[in-house]
């Protein structure tokens, strides 16, 4: 079990997370100087916050990063608590871009993308160091191209990590622990919800958990309904990082973190009885099992965010705006 499951899974997960962090850091370097200003100026209403939260999360490839930034801005007094509600809903929609890309089965592009990204980075590094082209060396676009090469490298590593993790699917399928879990999940899909929440809270990445589930569903190791339950749980578990980030902050910052939990948990609990319908819709959209999981994640987050959006306009939330 150690050699066939744990070691390959940990290696694949490490490569996947390395790719995710490279993408996040490089994209944050590209957008970082403008992100705080955009969030501050463009979130006057919940619907504006939803739009900005969606775009910034899709660009940064990290809902956690945007949520933590929002909490930090609230703690610093740059944003008020009511203005973050739309941002939180938007991050849930924007994060679907990652799972949709994984669901496209672009694994064959990993090596070409890695070679291309390394070539781009080396070219920009040489142009920046050599004094043969002073005009190019001082060009403003050079750092942007360099950061773009790091983004491509991160995406290539993400695809490589997914391939490695999905490769242990058959070994996991034969393990007694997985058989026990499937038996319990056949009795109640709530086991899948709990597993998704706990695993995502432990690894701090809903994309990694959902990616693994895509692999299991693709090889038939897990039924689509159970996979959807795990996805719903992952949307709850992803709130753990925001809760940790709010510790020691202001009451307003803590309200943001707990609002994230309430909105995500409420949406998951609301859609649990409709897992069969979600599975039917996703099967109608895509014939690929991985694509079905990705589309379910997208449908769930869009619908739950739109359902919750009108409640963000209630006067109650304006009164819940402590100064400290």
Residue ranges and their predicted role:
Residues 1-50, 144-198, 216-219:
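Helix-loop-helix hairpins and the membrane-proximal interhelical loops
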Residues 2-8, 85-88, 101-165:
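Signature of multi-pass transmembrane helix bundles
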Residues 3, 7, 145, 149, ...:
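Alpha-helical transmembrane segments of multi-pass inner-membrane proteins
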Residues 20, 24, 98, 203, ...:
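Alpha-helical transmembrane segments of multipass membrane proteins
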Residues 21-29, 70-77, 124-136, 242-250:
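C-terminal ends of transmembrane helices
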Residues 22-30, 34, 100, 164-171, ...:
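Membrane-spanning helices that line or support transport/gating and their immediate boundary helices
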Residues 57-60, 65-92, 99-122, 200-238, ...:
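Membrane-interfacial helix-loop connectors
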Residues 162, 174, 178-182, 253-324:
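Transmembrane alpha-helical segments and their short flanking loops
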């Amino acid at each position: 079990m150690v050699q066939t499951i744990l070691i390959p899974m940990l290696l694949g997960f490490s490569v996947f997370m390395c790719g995710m962090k490279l993408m996040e850091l490089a994209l944050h370097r590209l957008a970082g100087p403008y992100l705080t200003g955009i969030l501050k100026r463009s979130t006057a209403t919940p619907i504006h916050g939803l739009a900005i939260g969606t775009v910034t999360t899709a660009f940064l490839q990290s809902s956690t990063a945007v949520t933590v930034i929002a909490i930090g801005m609230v703690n610093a007094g740059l944003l008020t608590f009511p203005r973050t509600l739309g941002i939180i809903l938007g991050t849930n929609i924007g994060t679907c871009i990652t799972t949709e890309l994984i669901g496209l089965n672009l694994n064959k592009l990993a090596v070409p993308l890695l070679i291309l990204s390394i070539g781009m980075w080396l070219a920009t590094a040489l142009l920046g160091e050599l004094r043969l082209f002073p005009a190019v060396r001082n060009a403003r676009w050079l750092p942007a191209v360099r950061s773009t090469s790091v983004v491509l490298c991160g995406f290539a590593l993400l695809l490589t990590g997914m391939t490695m993790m999905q490769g242990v699917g058959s070994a996991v399928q034969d393990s007694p622990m997985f058989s026990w879990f499937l038996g319990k999940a056949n009795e109640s899909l709530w086991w899948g919800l709990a597993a998704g929440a706990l695993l995502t809270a432990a690894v701090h990445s809903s994309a990694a958990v959902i990616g693994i589930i895509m692999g299991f569903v693709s090889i038939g190791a897990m039924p689509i309904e159970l996979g959807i339950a795990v996805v719903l749980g992952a949307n709850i578990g992803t709130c753990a990082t925001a809760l940790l980030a709010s510790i020691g902050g202001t009451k307003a910052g803590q309200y943001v973190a707990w609002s994230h939990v309430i909105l995500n948990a409420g949406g998951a609990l609301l859609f649990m009885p409709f897992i069969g319908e979600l599975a039917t819709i996703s099967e109608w959209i895509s014939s690929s099992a991985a694509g079905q999981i990705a589309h379910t994640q997208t449908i769930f987050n869009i619908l739950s965010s739109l359902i919750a959006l009108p409640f963000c306009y209630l006067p109650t939330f304006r009164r819940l705006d402590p100064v400290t």
